[in-house]
Amino acid sequence: PFVGRNDVERRVVINTVGPHWDGNQVWFITGGGAIFAAWPLVYATAFSGFYWAMLVVLWALFFRPVGFDYRSKIHNATWRSTWDWGLFIGGAVPPLIFGVAFGNLLQGVPFGFDDYLISTYTGTFWQLLNPFALLAGVVSSAMITMHGGMYLAHRTEGAIQQRAIRGAVGAAALMVLAFVGAGLWLKFGGIEGFVITSAIDPGALPDPLAKTVARSADAWWLNYRAQPLLWLLPALGVAGALAAAALVLARRTLSAFVARSEEHTSELQSPLNIS
């Protein structure tokens, strides 16, 4: 509802994602299935501890298939505007929730296992909405907004392209500020990280009850000190966003979209601290 100012422009925006949205949404299901196959304990803990958050994502995603299919069924401005906002909710809420979830994972989520390895989440829903997790949600939302803006800038022209470029550049600036701010918060804000202190046997069966970790505010930087090349990962995240913003301003939209994809990949790297 922001890039397209009238029904025709909004129809153009919808048409740019129409051939791809359902395939992209399948990746959410594939990701959940892959987590269940690879790390069933992680799947059980995440989907139980983040139960209400997952439901919010699911409810938001309901708007997408219905909105794409039913928006044009009735030639009524109120009807179409309602579904435009529904599509906006379906696109904006999931990245925000996923960012908040990753922010909580970085800080640690309170849960425990019983003797049968059944996990129990001991926190509350409102504890998940802590300041650092919300900042991670801002990073995620800005990153996805920038990605969408780059895509629209490449696939459209005229006034829609101009608004998409402005939105993408603004989202890039917000993402860089929030991303760097989160790093400074980890460095100087006293947020503790985790270090695995127990021995790791690659040939042994996984047993979370046999592992121990220690919390330390310095834990975030252990791997960076041991492997200085890891600093390239956050640097590439910032550089990719800035390069994409510069390229899209120069109307090199395809190059900007590629740079944006590379920056997105670098931001997903999170080295594990092991001692």
What do the PLM-derived regions correspond to, one by one?
Residues F257-E263:
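Central hydrophobic cores of alpha-helical transmembrane segments
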Residues V248-A256:
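Membrane-helix interface "capping/anchor" motifs
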Residues D7-R11, N15, A44-S48, R80-D84, ...:
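Membrane-helix interfacial "entry" motifs
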Residues H20-V93, G112, V195-S198, Y224-R225:
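Membrane-interface helix-loop-helix modules in multi-pass inner-membrane proteins
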Residues P1-N15, H147, R155:
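Membrane-interface helix-loop junction between the first two transmembrane segments
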Residues I14-H20, I274:
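Bacterial Type III/flagellar export signals at protein N-termini
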Residues H264-I274:
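Single conserved hydrophobic/aromatic residue that forms the stacking wall/gate
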Residues Y70-V248:
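Long, contiguous internal "core" modules enriched in hydrophobic/ aromatic residues
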